[in-house]
Amino acid sequence: MRRRPFVAGLVPALLAPRSRAAVAPERAAASAPAAKIAGAASSTSVADDAMPRGVTHRALRFPADHGAHPDTHVEWWYVTGWLSGGGGGGEVDARTAPEFGFQVTFFRTRTGLAETSASRFAARQLVFAHVALIDLAAGAKDGGGSLHDQRAAREGFGFVQVPAASGTQVVQLRDWSMRREPTADASRLHIAVRSDRFALALDLAGTQGVLLQGDAGYSQKGPDPRQASHYYSEPQLAVRGRVERAGAPARAVTGRAWLDHEWSNEYLGAEALGWDWVGFNLLDGAALMAFRLRYADGSASWAGGSYRSAAGVLTTFAATEVRFEPQRRWTSPRTQAAYPVEWILTTPAGRWRVVALHDDQELDSRGSTGSIYWEGVSALRREDGGTVGYGYLELTGYAGRLRL
């Protein structure tokens, strides 16, 4: 499934004139409308019938579907991963234990407003970005290892959509960017983010093919056929680059990452509160994804997932075949939200323990998408405690119902 431009309440905020002096620094920065999405799969620069519109049972087409789909309500490009020191020229070792976890996410939402306006200021599309870095050693010592930042912008002033056939796809919000290079054999992405307290400059290289989630990229999110998305993943991305923290020298790092790209017109059912999601790169080269949408009483309204073995054999999970069982909760001292940070996860591919590598990985994004959620680097372990992979756990709807 995945991700999540939790945008309720943000449209009026971005439409209204605001004094930069009247908001916090990160919110003032967010108001600058300088967003760009290049490589759109459907845009005003291509014919209306160039791509199927909306979410339908269709074959995904690449490289076009790496780009934006502005005819849909919500869309995200979501990269999470783990890093460790050692940026030499050798092969990236997927078995090295994490020193850092990182998240870089770009969201796009179609507001449904000013659709016929010719004004460059019309907020037809909004773009948001979240970035986070967790230093596991620093976090274990003093709780100060978790850093994050956010931005938001409305369409206009450099928000550009160009045909995917032009080659390179770019998702950019001012100087934060995720750029995909066209290559014949595998994905190659470049991420550049600089915040006041940290910076990331990462190169990601595909080691496997695209993983189409659900029914060949059509992912059901509920019993209503309208509750669906187009969804694909790129697991086992080899990462190489640099991490900087304020007051510390830059570190050369390598690691592994997971990319999700998903777009939808309707996600949550009326009674759903939020969701739980995991994406793990296993040490043997396999990939595991599982999710459940959740009612207020904690029961699942829908679920799904997939497991692709190191040999490339794909198993897709039915809604009734995935079970999340919370084992331990951490309560945020800031919001009092209680997040399950350890789980027993049962799927047709196996039964595992999901364990957060640091409890405090709560993200307050009320300055952009209006939500508070938990997103953190975690380990996937056998029931006997042996680690079989690393990845990310995402928990939404614990600090209040999520509204898309």
Whereabouts are the PLM-identified features?
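Structured soluble/peripheral alpha/beta segments that form catalytic or ligand/cofactor-binding pockets
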Residues: 22-404
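N-terminal export signals
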Residues: 5-27
